[in-house]
Amino acid sequence: MLANDQKPVLIVGGAQGIGKEIAERFLKEGHRVAVSDIDEQGLSLLKKQHSELLTFQADVSSWESVQQMISAAERELGGIAHLVYSAGMTKSLPFLEVDFSLWKKTLAVNLYGLYYCIKASAPYICERQEGSIVVIGSGSAITGSGGGIQYYASKAGAFGLMRSLVKELGAHHVRINVIAPRVIESQMLDTLYPTEVEKRQLQSLIPVGRLGRPDDIAGLTLFLTSDEGSYLHGQIILLDGGRTYQPKYTEGKRAER
């Protein structure tokens, strides 16, 4: 077990997938946990599985909704020490097929929502003079990838947002970091790579020989909020099993992208 402060945690986008795994990991470590999501049904199911959780339905693309959610979470949790932003949406389309509606909707969730949640929660976290913010980003915003320009642009924007806050938040002893995974077993991966053949081809590109799992992200998130992670600040941590390093040959076979 990490030497964790077990202070209250708010996870935005935690009703399913990666966010849910993060919430369950923090619960296991003894934290007071609140989860926010737009998915009312997912929140209801999560609450049935973990009655000790606090849940709040919110639309992160709405500043008013975020304000109300953060205020309620701060009050009912007894404070917010750590914010984890795991909300996100994607759709894989060629650039010429991405219309303005999809562009705006994706940035509203992935970038504006992040800004809103930090804007609303930072006063509470900074007042404590300790705490952290962890953003679940995307490694493909570093490496680039075909299809989904609106998604990668929004995730790259999150990098800039994080870096711009390093000095200001650090002055209040609040740390901010981004976890940048690439291929993680999730609903989002199933959307982008719907067949087992595609998933196997993808796995062949990863030096460690497997796809990432939600618990890989949950464990790193826990570390970043722990005492052991207290000197990590302003970092983009690429979590991809070595995929970004793609050698020309692997075990006698040519590695194709």
Protein language model features and the residues they cover:
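Canonical Rossmann dinucleotide-binding motif of NAD(H)/NADP(H)-dependent dehydrogenases/reductases
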Residues: 2-33
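Alpha-helical segment proximal to the catalytic Tyr-Lys
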Residues: 123, 167-171, 230
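The beta1-alpha1 cofactor-binding region of Rossmann-like NAD(H)/NADP(H)-dependent oxidoreductases
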Residues: 58-68, 100, 215-216
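Substrate-binding pocket helix/loop in short-chain dehydrogenase/reductase
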Residues: 94-95, 102-107, 202
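Active-site helix of classical SDR
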Residues: 118, 154, 162
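Residue(s) in the substrate-gating loop at a strand-loop-helix junction
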Residues: 138
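Short C-terminal tail/terminal secondary-structure segment
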Residues: 222, 233-257
